[in-house]
Curated annotation (Swiss-Prot):
Subunit architecture: Homodimer.
The protein, known as: Histidine--tRNA ligase
Gene giving rise to this polypeptide: hisS
Organism: Bacteroides thetaiotaomicron (strain ATCC 29148 / DSM 2079 / JCM 5827 / CCUG 10774 / NCTC 10582 / VPI-5482 / E50)
CDD domains named in the record: HisRS-like_core, HisRS_anticodon
Major localisation: cytoplasm
GO molecular function: ATP binding; histidine-tRNA ligase activity
């Protein structure tokens, strides 16, 4: 007996209806990116591991899918190394490539490699899949699409403002109510300074970024495990639990971080971004959230995250400023900021809230019934005119029984069927049937087109 086929955990197949929904998401995001002057690029699915490793922190590096070298990859490995059973060390010997973890690091690599061809500031967008060796669960997949927009070659905070406008516009078009959360890595660095743990900034941010998932008690336990003193943890509590309006939070931070030049710079940047956005009249809520600490090594300024308000799911968009990212590829002094829409989670949110527009998921609008070669030839001439008018139409390929053809149309949710028999051909017309109401009318091809366009 043949083995039952399956797909890897954390991956999915998509039906035609699901693909129509996904394309609605991609096209909506793409249209908004174009409105703001972004241009599209693509990069390979696989990158050199030297490009990927060390860019996402220790936790991120563990989630990289590594690609085994072809050929006799054991030839350069000693018996001693094999017997050591050190998986990380062995992997470095026979894996030189990996699947991309996100689109930001490959983009930084692209900028460095193509610097002489790029006009700066460079506004690029990219819609491609990424892979993470994560534990699959609701809303978390091992293969998923990201829809990134980044600006490199400009320090201006107007870039952050525009990216938040893009987020607001996209989710307004989707009719998804969201909260846009913003923080600044400099504020987090300032907090680490004033509690006397400046050298533990990465440990602190990785821990407090988990606050929503594991709770305050477990965050504090993790901080203690990392060697952060009880006194420092106590000082941290009122800061990360700070409440009030954005203006009130900023006022408190100005007082708390007064002794930290880095922290005050972060407050200044956040104040500019939030103040400018306030004059733009965003449709969605924006919140300064000090627990937002996106545990990635490359963010250096503003950081963003977007949560859906009407459904329980993780972050559906995130991003931030990464001033030093291209430096690791030999191109210093290039500042960048970007956002990434999680298309797969947005897909789930739109499904749960039933927010897909009917026209976005409709496929064939009109099907011609096939009674035989002569009728099919007549229908094909009408079909050409219908398609030229931009109507999605098809003809049933076989002269099957009427019941089978109608069942096919119903299964595909085709709203109209055109019936062409001998009588219709004699009049040069078709019988147009509304599949929802059952109403039938004898129409010319021009009348048929007009009926479907109305």
């Amino acid at each position: 007996m043949a083995a039952k086929p399956s797909i890897p955990k954390g991956t999915r197949d998509f039906s035609p209806v699901e693909m129509a929904k996904r394309n609605y998401i991609f096209n909506t995001i793409r249209d908004v990116y174009h409105l703001y002057g972004f241009q599209q690029i693509e990069t390979p699915s696989m990158e050199m591991l030297s490009t990927l490793m060390g860019k996402y922190g220790d936790e991120g590096d563990k989630l990289l899918f590594k690609i085994q070298n072809s050929g006799d990859y054991f030839s350069g490995i000693t018996d001693e190394e094999l017997l050591s059973r050190n998986a990380v060390k062995l992997a470095s010997k026979f894996c030189e490539k990996g699947l991309r973890y996100d689109l930001t690091v490959p983009f930084a690599r692209y900028v460095v490699m193509h610097r002489d061809e790029i006009t700066f500031p460079f506004k690029r967008y990219q819609i491609q899949p990424v892979w993470r060796a994560d534990r699959p669960q609701k809303g978390r997949y091992r293969e998923f699409y990201q829809c990134d927009a980044d600006v490199v070659g400009s320090d201006s905070l107007l870039n952050e403002v525009e990216l938040m406008q893009i987020v607001d516009t996209v989710f307004s078009r989707f009719n998804i109510r969201v909260c846009i959360k913003i923080n600044n890595r400099k504020i987090l660095s300032g907090i680490a300074e004033i509690i006397g743990e400046a050298d533990k900034i990465v440990d602190i941010t990785v821990a407090i970024d988990k606050l929503d998932k594991i709770g305050l008690e477990n965050v504090n336990a993790e901080l203690k495990e990392k060697g952060i003193s009880d006194e420092a943890i106590a000082k941290l509590q009122p800061i990360i639990l700070l409440s009030g309006t954005n203006t009130e939070k900023l006022a408190t931070l100005k007082s708390v971080l007064a002794a930290s030049e880095t922290g005050m710079k972060g407050v200044e940047e956040s104040e500019f971004i939030l103040g400018t956005l306030e004059t733009m009249g965003l449709k969605n809520e924006i919140e300064l959230d000090l627990t937002l600490a996106r545990g990635l090594n490359y963010y250096t300024g503003a950081i963003f995250e977007v949560k859906a308000l009407d459904v329980q799911i993780g972050s559906i968009t995130g991003g931030g400023r990464y001033d030093n990212l291209t430096g690791v590829f030999g191109m210093a002094g290039v500042s960048g900021v970007g956002i990434s829409f999680g298309a797969d989670r947005i897909f789930d949110v739109l499904n749960q809230l039933e927010l897909y527009p009917k026209e976005a998921v409709n496929g064939t609008e009109l099907m011609f019934v096939n009674f035989g070669d002569k009728e099919a030839a007549f229908s094909m001439s009408m079909l050409a005119k219908v398609r030229a008018a931009g109507i999605r139409a098809e003809i049933f390929p076989d002269a099957a029984k009427m019941k089978k053809q109608m069942s096919y149309a119903n299964a595909k949710s085709v709203p109209f069927v055109a019936i062409v028999g001998e009588n219709e051909m004699n009049e040069g017309k078709a019988m147009l049937k509304n599949m929802e109401t059952g109403e039938q009318n004898l129409v010319s091809v021009e009348e048929l087109i007009a009926a479907l366009r109305n």
